Amino acid sequence: MKIAYLGKIQLSDVDLSYLHEAQKLADVDYIMEVNPRFLKGPAFNIGKIYPKSGLFKAVDIYPEMIRLQGQIDLERFYILNTCGRFWLFKSFVTNILLLVFLIRGKYTRIHLAWPPHVYELVLYFLSRKMLLTVHDPFPHTGNDSAIVRFRRKIAFRLIPRLIILNRKQRQDFLDFYRLSPERVIDSQLSCYTYLRSVASDEASFGISGRYILFAGKISRYKGLDYLLPAMKRVHRECPDCRLIVAGGGKFHFDTTEYETLDFIEIRNRFIPDDEMVALIKNCAFMVCPYTDATQSGVIMSAFAFNKPVIATNVGGLPEMVKDRHYGLIIKEKDVDALAESIVSLWRDPELTASFSEEIRRDYSTGEKSWRHIAALLFKEYA
């Protein structure tokens, strides 16, 4: 069996974690797109794009990729590189090169991590061999657009098998897109084990003391407009409780009143892997106060270091954060519920320690491990 895995830099943490196990089971080639729009992601921070367009072995054009040795097979790691002022137009050409590569490779299956962009539509020539992981059965608030809907509609119509990562939204997904049940494969995320290979030093990033963490790209649906007011209430009961907000993106509300508070620190920028790992490893627990969701890579990053999570009762989050086992599930859009849950965990280190132990036990082996998930997906590849 020979598999081509077409990943995205913005999903590289989950891709690398999955491929670490998948490449043990068969020949899996990893092909990742790099262009001026996509140079940074959870596992990559490419400072300068290679000045030629084409399909290359990753280490041949980005020698720094050698750091992934031991995580994935570097001989099977390729970069689809598109550069220059008119990169968007050049992408149509580089994707033709990718199509030729896939045809010559005679792959059994082609696994896509994201619905193809307009400049990738040529890849549908091989649609009969494709599977697609649908990370978001429904677009997040603020991330929907006509072009996104178009890409999803084409993908769901042409790609024979679709993989979803939570069961709660399965029936709604089938009904909304009018899909036959046999086309949709149930799977799940495991913790982002790739992050464990990242060296980090908390002293280098100004990390000290006890704190809780919100991490990830700033988006409207992430619920920071509920978390920041909640922290004012938390501070009245637990003056020593600090929140660090770490992630790039634009706030959709005015944060001026929170920027001067000594118990809230906002790092509103791209957070490289080593800093993110240091922040997660040293926090007491993480908070995901999302107003809508499918599943969450942030939660899987927390679980890589056995950190409990407070999450809201939206989308597939309750499947990921088993209430009172891996953390707490609370009502969404509720400042009081957020404040009460934060105070509860902050005051009870023994409870957070017990949650951490359950995460470590359940995600190391068994049905929540990447080994188990990869084995099940390979049955679908066959």
Residues covered by each model-derived region:
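A conserved mid-protein helix/loop that constitutes part of the nucleotide-sugar donor-binding site
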Residues: 13-17, 219-233, 300, 336
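A short, histidine- and acid-enriched strand-loop-helix "catalytic/donor-clamping" loop
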Residues: 82-83, 115-120, 130-146, 160-161, ...
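Donor nucleotide-sugar binding/catalytic pocket of nucleotide-sugar-dependent glycosyltransferases
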Residues: 158-197
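Conserved donor-binding/catalytic core segment of Leloir-type glycosyltransferases
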Residues: 204-222, 228-231, 244
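Nucleotide-activated donor-binding/catalytic signature segment of Leloir-type glycosyltransferases, i.e.
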Residues: 254-278
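Conserved acidic donor-binding segment of nucleotide-sugar-dependent glycosyltransferases
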Residues: 266, 323-324, 328-335, 344-350
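Acidic donor-binding loop of glycosyltransferase active sites
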Residues: 278-294, 307
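A short, well-ordered alpha-helix in the C-terminal region of glycosyltransferases
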Residues: 337, 344, 351-366, 376
